[in-house]
Amino acid sequence: MHRDVRNSGGELIVDEAFIDYCPDATVRHHVQDGLTVVGSLTKILCIPGVRLGYICAAPEQIARLQERAVTWSLNVLASAVAAELPRHQAEIAADAQANQARAERFARCLQEMGVRVTAGCVPFLLADFGHDMTKTVQHLRAQHILVRTCDSFGLPANYLRLAVKTDAENDLLMKVLYRENFDAR
């Protein structure tokens, strides 16, 4: 794909924000002219207020980006987090593996309910319930359970993107989804 984009005069930007969940899939070691990789150092840590990321690109691209960079691109909190990251690599890898196991269990349980699930190595599942989920999403919201609809992805209302949480949180969501969608049938 990169070659095709480069040959057409374009540049390819790869978003690896969740790459810590599937580190073998990274392309950051293959950066060359016309290929830029952006990543986050805080997604796996679940600290959304901390903006800490990186860009891997050819030296010329980095120079162009530095010309436009703001003076204070890293705040003190993000800097402190960055300083601690190397000491926690084993924990981060273990968390990613544990999350994968939770995702596999969550997907199996949803599939047993008849939901078509597309899983990957990120902490989300794409779930096709086979019918419009608009009312279910409203009922979930009323119970302070938030799920992501997929209309902004161009998918119909029968799809939801479900975050993989703890087993207890996943079980609660499945219980409510079952009650909302399958008990009445």
Regions found by a protein language model. Give the residues of each.
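Active-site pre-lysine segment of PLP-dependent enzymes
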Residues: 1-12, 16-47
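Residue-level detector of anion-binding/catalytic polar loops
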Residues: 11, 116, 146
